[in-house]
Regions:
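Bacterial N-terminal signal peptides that target proteins for export
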Residues: 1-11
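Hydrophobic core
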Residues: 12-21
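Sec-dependent signal peptide cleavage junction
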Residues: 20-32
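Post-signal peptide N-terminal regions of Sec-secreted extracellular proteins
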Residues: 30-35, 112, 120-132, 215-218
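Glycine-rich catalytic cores of cysteine/serine-nucleophile enzymes that process amide/ester linkages
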Residues: 32-112
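Second-shell loop/turn segments in exported
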Residues: 48-49, 113-119, 132-141
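Solvent-exposed, acidic/flexible segments
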Residues: 52-55, 120-127, 139-147
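Activation targets extended, charge/polar-rich intrinsically disordered C-terminal tails
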Residues: 129-219
Length: 219
């Protein structure tokens, strides 16, 4: 029991330290992201708790608001449609990394909407910065998990600022404590052929077909 308390204290200390480093960078990014241009995408920050809030999954969803194609990372989104983007560790057959449309396919297939969210509308320039962040992502381990990917990508341009919390319970609390949060937003239902894994980073990144099915292991 003493060891568990000590481990918990260490994790909380690391979370606070990470937040202290991320905050100045994210605040500056928000200032750079301020723009009165046309909003081209509605970006959602989604969190679905699991196992009595002890675990969960966090991801982003991008809805095209225009009458033309928009680019989210490596994925082209048609007018009126959207794409989910999330980082996975173990609950995926094709290995750790960033995936497109896994959440949208899984949650539509299972007909579940027990997730909470925040949303914001962003301009084309802001979307370009978000896409750059996605293309540079791909690493997954316990301290840099799905929450880390979603929060640090959201914070590139969006308000409210979200502090990275490795513990799913704290991610959930950050969302529901915001008076503008919602529950169960609708996502475009992609076919299995529209699910991809991002392989490589930056200019070397590419898409490969991926299996959206869950392995049953914790995310």
């Amino acid at each position: 029991m003493k060891h568990l308390k000590r481990i918990t204290a260490i994790v909380l200390a690391l979370v606070i330290m990470a937040g202290a480093f991320i905050l100045p960078t994210s605040a500056a990014a928000q200032e750079r992201g301020a723009s009165d241009g046309e909003k081209v995408v509605r970006m959602y920050f989604g969190h679905r708790p699991r196992y009595a809030y002890l675990s969960g999954h966090t991801w982003l969803y991008f809805e095209n608001l225009t009458n033309h194609d928009v680019q989210v990372g490596l994925y082209t989104v048609k007018p009126g449609k959207g794409v989910s983007v999330g980082s996975y560790g173990y609950d995926i057959e094709d290995g750790r990394g960033v995936y497109y449309n896994v959440e949208a396919h899984r949650y539509n297939s299972a007909k579940v909407n027990d997730y909470v969210y925040l949303s914001t509308e962003i301009t084309e320039k802001q979307l370009e910065r978000v896409s750059e962040k996605i293309l540079l992502s791909g690493t997954w381990f316990y301290m840099l998990n799905c929450s880390y990917f979603a929060i640090t990508t959201w914070d590139v341009v969006s308000k409210p600022f979200l502090m990275y919390m490795v513990i799913p319970t704290f991610v959930h609390l950050q969302v529901i404590m915001n008076p503008n949060h919602g529950t169960g937003f609708k996502m475009y239902y992609p076919s299995r052929s529209e699910v991809f894994k991002q392989v490589g980073r930056g200019d070397n990144a590419r898409l490969e077909p991926a299996n959206p099915d869950s392995t049953g292991r914790m995310i």
